[in-house]
Amino acid sequence: MAKIIWTRTDEAPLLATYSLKPVVEAFAATAGIEVETRDISLAGRILAQFPERLTEDQKVGNALAELGELAKTPEANIIKLPNISASVPQLKAAIKELQDQGYDIPELPDNATTDEEKDILARYNAVKGSAVNPVLREGNSDRRAPIAVKNFVKKFPHRMGEWSADSKTNVATMDANDFRHNEKSIILDAADEVQIKHIAADGTETILKDSLKLLEGEVLDGTVLSAKALDAFLLEQVARAKAEGILFSAHLKATMMKVSDPIIFGHVVRAYFADVFAQYGEQLLAAGLNGENGLAAILSGLESLDNGEEIKAAFEKGLEDGPDLAMVNSARGITNLHVPSDVIVDASMPAMIRTSGHMWNKDDQEQDTLAIIPDSSYAGVYQTVIEDCRKNGAFDPTTMGTVPNVGLMAQKAEEYGSHDKTFRIEADGVVQVVSSNGDVLIEHDVEANDIWRACQVKDAPIQDWVKLAVTRSRLSGMPAVFWLDPERAHDRNLASLVEKYLADHDTEGLDIQILSPVEATQLSIDRIRRGEDTISVTGNVLRDYNTDLFPILELGTSAKMLSVVPLMAGGGLFETGAGGSAPKHVQQVQEENHLRWDSLGEFLALAESFRHELNNNGNTKAGVLADALDKATEKLLNEEKSPSRKVGEIDNRGSHFWLTKFWADELAAQTEDADLAATFAPVAEALNTGAADIDAALLAVQGGATDLGGYYSPNEEKLTNIMRPVAQFNEIVDALKK
């Protein structure tokens, strides 16, 4: 039997799964397809690390490792929903919840000194940050706005904040001594096993990474961010935001960049509270309160210090004296610096641009902002859009073009695979990458506390990326632009390989060019304003940034993107949108039993997954399901049956009901497959007859508080009861499986 894997993840998409997946299972079964769940939630991944500490009933398999292997086979057909990329505070909260539920798992050690503690820390580090996507992404990325969604937005545009020509909003970024400026890059002419080592000024050698296996043709880079230069830059920006009377905000990616960015976040916190750290720094650092887990962790940790109240007062004075901070939650006093994972650059910058260049201040009012993006590799993209909006005003969703993306992602490409090669430097000296025969391939002078890192990209993914770009340009008729920076050593190497591999393809009649990220941004937004479309062909980080930036401006959200990963072994990975897992949506369910999560991303991914089954295995019924689902999705949009934000109006469960009805209607009416038409005729009839009652019942359950039985590890039975509250609807769906 053909199989589709549906991932069980976290937060809002997990809740939605309990409503939608029974429908998917029932419909897929009519085409001979089994839908199997694999648990890659944060809780599931934690438990998989400690099998020896669990009872037989509690043990779970390592679903992520199994899916990683499956992704390397032609049989893979995986639907991947958003999951938590855990920061340390989230990880600690999940551990505590699991312990309270009776799981004998250890605490996360803050300072691992014994072998046992080091082993525990290594296991938790495997779960921390963006631990899922790099394992599953054995292919490059093809993300685009489906035509149905684009058409819907033109009819029902989302709100775009007006821009003022006098806006003081800007991006602040380093102009020297950051990752971009210090990068060195090589292309290996033969396979090798290299070593990364640190040689201190006194001659002491430390092996940072003993064995890094590299293939022929692989691109390897090393670079370093100077801690002194970073601190000087940050102090300047704190003063600048204060002088200009605008909000101070930091935009990093502490989830995916789980080694470098929490360190940088700590520098930001210490720079903002420079006076507090000048006075109490030694004591704070000794207590592990260095800012890397955010201001909230510091304030919590102060409770165990004798003079904690005194230091807390100093932090409060620091907030009064410093520039106003951008707020995550004004009502609760949660600032941009409270939690490293609260403000993630790829989501926060487009949201700011969409909102007139404003973020929220402590009075819950919009205000101009200084957006701190310390490393300058990609900051210019956002500054270019800001300057364009200052000059030309906000974009118009009813007329603007689209910017699909082809992203280099496979096999942990570039920065998003750098975590195991990123190091905080302990002492002044040099870092060297040394070949097996002792040649120094890359070398940097370093100082204590600098962040040094290496990135790699294998040759096969680069070839596949170029091929995918040509294919998408040919199929769509759009120009394709490779976003590569001639000022960066890595990008210069990549550009030479792009030119080499483009020669392997028929590019006649295609418009394919290579531009710097700033030039490519300007070209793309000039074309957007003329209603023209342009494919952005980017590395891994810009894949992530652009597939939030352009969809948020075009569609109001990145969750409505079609995200396909053609796996290099021939399988398919279908990601549901490009957004996160929406913790605020869960909060609303807990308070009001209303889930505003929009499953449009799941609907789009599911149709592509069925289509993959048709194309790979000749399953024509799967193709009929896909076409009918696309039509049902378009009808859902046009009839405005997507979830509302307000309690008492349609929510995620209601939208699932209407999708099911429209899908059954389409299947009953189609003439390609008589069996499916006959199967779905009574289903459609039952859903149409009961529509008013089912819709009313789904609205009636809203309004009261709910108990999920856990946040990271909710109770199965409670979730099922909350997400499938109407027996009449459930019986119609479940009857299909019999």
From Swiss-Prot:
Its EC number is 1.1.1.42. Optimum pH is 7.5-8.1. GO terms for biological process: glyoxylate cycle; tricarboxylic acid cycle. The keyword Cytoplasm applies. Pfam families: IDH. Mg(2+) binds at D346, D544, D548. Keywords: Cytoplasm, Glyoxylate bypass, Magnesium, Manganese, Metal-binding, NADP, Oxidoreductase, Tricarboxylic acid cycle. D-threo-isocitrate binds at S130, N133, R137, R143, K253, Y416, R543. Coiled coil: none annotated. Signal peptide: none annotated. It is found in: Cytoplasm. Weakly inhibited by oxaloacetate, 2-oxoglutarate and citrate. Severely inhibited by oxaloacetate plus glyoxylate. Binds 1 Mg(2+) or Mn(2+) ion per subunit. Mn(2+) is the most effective cation in vitro. Mg(2+) can partially replace Mn(2+), resulting in approximately 40% of the maximal activity. Monomer. Consists of two distinct domains, a small domain (domain I) and a large domain (domain II). Binding of isocitrate probably induces a conformational change. Catalyzes the oxidative decarboxylation of isocitrate to 2-oxoglutarate and carbon dioxide with the concomitant reduction of NADP(+). Cannot use NAD(+). Belongs to the monomeric-type IDH family. This is Isocitrate dehydrogenase [NADP].
